[in-house]
Amino acid sequence: MMEDKIIHTPRFDEQRRMRRKKRQRLQLFIFLSIVAIVSLILIYMFTSISYVKKISVNDTSINSTKTIKEKSGIQSNMRIYSLDTKQIVSNIEYLDGVKSVTVRRHFPNTVSINVEEYDVLGVVKDGEHYHPALENGQILHKHNYAEPSEVPLINNFSSKALNQLVKVLRASDTAIINQISEINFIPKVEASHRVQFYMKNGLEVIGDMRTIDNKLNYFPAMASKLKKDSNGRILKPGIIDLEIGAVFIPYESKQAEERRIELEAAMEERSEKDKAELEKSVEKLKKELNQVKKNS
């Protein structure tokens, strides 16, 4: 058998050398790239670059940024890649008024915390202090608000009645809630679910807690039909009675005066009842303390 012969020309040999060099350069580039990437990762992981440098928190109305940062448990000597985000979320969720929490890490050393709080529907007065009442029916007694201006002042509501009020406010338009300055719960024997709203435009709304959520949205239409001066103020303020139907009673009328006397009497009766219940609780506590002293 005749052996095949391969003839190598100078041009062919040169092309082989060029391909070999190109392959070697590519291999060297890949190797150096891997070394560089590994070096950067090691530098990032084991130097101060990966320590938490910044914690950003969104604006909140109940809990301060300082409180949220402290509750998160994040320290400046912690490395960002080792943070337990689930634990951070759990820590912050224990704060009053917190609805949900999201924690994200951002290269190289920033942590962002987004806290969603329950809406503040009103404030409850306790002596000289005002405490926020939330959309979930909770009253935050540990938190003090300044005298209310943007949210209504809520008076004389029991826990059960407050939960009913929350449902009413959540079902109402935000524009209407923003017009309310004060809400009073003034039940009587013949009207055990009566509620009174003082509006910022000088009007007063009376209704039944069980049906007011379907009627309160009528308020803007009724108010718009009343005569106003050049500055937009209502010329003849009065009562919008939504207990049975939807009737406007000017304050100057005899019917409004009778209604006013009835409502004031109901509020006074409610205050006396609350006072009596408080005195009864204090007396009970005194008896329990005396009994403890005797036993000791």
Curated annotation (Swiss-Prot):
| Residue ranges occupied by any POTRA domain in the UniProt entry | 50-118
What spans does the record annotate as topological domain Extracellular, numbered to this chain? Answer: 47-296
Pfam families per the UniProt record, alphabetical = FtsQ_DivIB_C (PF03799), POTRA_1 (PF08478)
Which keywords fit this entry according to its UniProt record? Cell cycle, Cell division, Cell membrane, Membrane, Transmembrane, Transmembrane helix
InterPro entries documented for this protein: Cell_div_FtsQ/DivIB_C, DivIB, FtsQ_DivIB, POTRA, POTRA_FtsQ_type
Cellular component aspect of the GO annotation: cell division site; plasma membrane
- Which domain of life does the UniProt lineage start with? Bacteria
Q: Which residues lie on this side of the membrane: Cytoplasmic?
A: 1-25
Q: Which residue ranges does UniProt annotate as crossing the membrane?
A: 26-46
From the UniProt record, list the coiled-coil ranges: none
State the membrane topology.
Single-pass type II membrane protein
Task: Note whether Cell membrane occurs among the keywords.
Answer: yes
Where does the protein end up?
Cell membrane
Task: Tell me which Gene Ontology terms the entry assigns under biological process.
Answer: FtsZ-dependent cytokinesis
What this protein is reported to do is described as: Cell division protein that may be involved in stabilizing or promoting the assembly of the division complex.
Q: Which HAMAP family match?
A: DivIB
Name the protein family. Answer: Belongs to the FtsQ/DivIB family. DivIB subfamily.
What name goes with this protein? Cell division protein DivIB
Annotated source species: Macrococcus caseolyticus (strain JCSC5402)
Higher taxonomy: Bacteria, Bacillati, Bacillota, Bacilli, Bacillales
